[in-house]
């Protein structure tokens, strides 16, 4: 039982990182922008959020928990949103190719994140740690996690960022399905010319969706550093965040662009990713590490094949996804 609970715990934390990225990318893609710069943006969010928290706690004699959280999340969100702004300017205003721009942003973002993350590593060391921020981000709910036995271990033994990820996913779903602004955003992603003719400012919606979506993605990066990796930034942290961000991109396809489904989808990805470590202990079956880590991508490919065979409009990507909109051609 202990191994099963440990498997669920690490899968939930792992999946929550992917969940931030998937929700952010879903908002972006709902506006018709295919942002393959997600890995770079998440890396920037992780690096700058960590550096912000580290500099705050080392420069203040008695750091405040709320301010530490505000600095870490605020820095991560703003820097990541700026990455989305760069992408929006290049693709929406200058009509650059979205695929090339996104991949370029990934290379740039990962490199920039590694550079600034390494800035706070002491000379001669390979890593550094933000102890106070880690304590805050990894703090569990005292009563619920300690007094409810197995239920507490499974549901309440996480830091606040896990629950924030759930809230963000649910709010994104309600926004896209229940609000006029969300419906306008979906209209922009499906048919920008028609949306423009109806009086919707296509450019504004694309910019806002991409910047806010990128900001949410960046929160996944800072969650990875300050909780999942126990507040440690190492020279290899940027590469690790990049790999999880690609899982987020795959998850968007897997959930068919529905943020609420990203909740269970991200946890499923987490369980599959860590199966190689826990299945041998639980049922005695040895699982190849590389094959286990491939499972989420294989599942995504199968979903793509099945959905294309069904040809249901509900299972398809936004019609204008990846396409530049030229207003003069409407």
Regions flagged by a language model, labelled:
Residues 1-22, 34, 48, 57-71:
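Membrane-interfacial amphipathic/re-entrant helices at transmembrane-helix boundaries
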Residues 190-197, 203-204, 279-330:
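Cytosolic-side transmembrane-helix boundaries in multi-pass membrane proteins
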Residues 27, 51, 55, 85, ...:
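Membrane-interface helix caps of multi-pass small-molecule transporters
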Residues 109-177, 232-233, 238, 283-292, ...:
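Transmembrane helix-bundle core of multi-pass membrane transporters
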Residues 62-112, 273:
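Alpha-helical transmembrane segments within multi-pass membrane transporters and channels
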Residues 154-233, 264:
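Helix-loop-helix "hairpin" substructures at the membrane interface of multi-pass membrane proteins
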Residues 217, 227, 231-297:
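Transmembrane alpha-helical segments in multi-pass inner-membrane proteins
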Residues 21, 46-50, 110-114, 162-174, ...:
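Hydrophobic core segments of alpha-helical transmembrane domains in multi-pass membrane transport
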């Amino acid at each position: 039982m202990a191994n099963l609970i440990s498997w669920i715990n690490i899968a939930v934390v792992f999946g929550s990182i992917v969940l931030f990225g998937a929700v952010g990318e879903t908002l972006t893609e709902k506006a018709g922008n295919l942002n393959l710069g997600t890995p770079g943006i998440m890396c920037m969010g992780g690096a700058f959020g960590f550096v912000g928290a580290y500099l705050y706690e080392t420069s203040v004699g008695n750091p405040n928990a709320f301010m530490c959280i505000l600095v870490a999340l605020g820095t991560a969100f703003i820097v990541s949103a700026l990455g989305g702004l760069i992408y929006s300017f290049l693709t929406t205003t200058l009509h650059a190719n979205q695929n090339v721009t996104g991949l370029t942003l990934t290379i740039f973002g990962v490199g920039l994140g590694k550079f600034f993350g390494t800035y706070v590593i002491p000379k001669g060391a390979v890593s550094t740690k933000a102890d106070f921020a880690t304590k805050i981000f990894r703090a569990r709910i005292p009563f619920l996690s300690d007094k409810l036995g197995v239920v507490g271990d499974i549901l309440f033994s996480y830091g606040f960022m896990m629950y924030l990820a759930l809230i963000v996913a649910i709010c994104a779903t309600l926004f896209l399905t229940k609000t006029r602004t969300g419906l306008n955003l979906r209209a922009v992603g499906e048919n920008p010319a028609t949306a423009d003719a109806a009086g919707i400012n296509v450019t504004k919606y694309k910019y806002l969706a991409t910047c806010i979506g990128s900001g949410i993605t960046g929160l996944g990066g800072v969650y990875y550093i300050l909780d999942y990796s126990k507040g440690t930034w190492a020279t290899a942290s940027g590469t690790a965040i990049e790999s999880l961000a690609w899982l987020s991109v795959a998850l968007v396809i897997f959930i068919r662009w529905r943020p609420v489904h990203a909740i269970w989808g991200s946890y499923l990805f987490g369980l599959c990713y860590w199966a190689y470590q826990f299945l041998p202990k639980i049922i005695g079956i040895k699982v190849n590490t590389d094959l286990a880590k491939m499972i989420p991508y294989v599942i995504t490919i199968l979903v793509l094949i099945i959905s294309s065979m069904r040809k249901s409009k509900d299972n398809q990507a936004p019609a204008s996804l990846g396409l530049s909109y030229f207003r003069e051609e409407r």
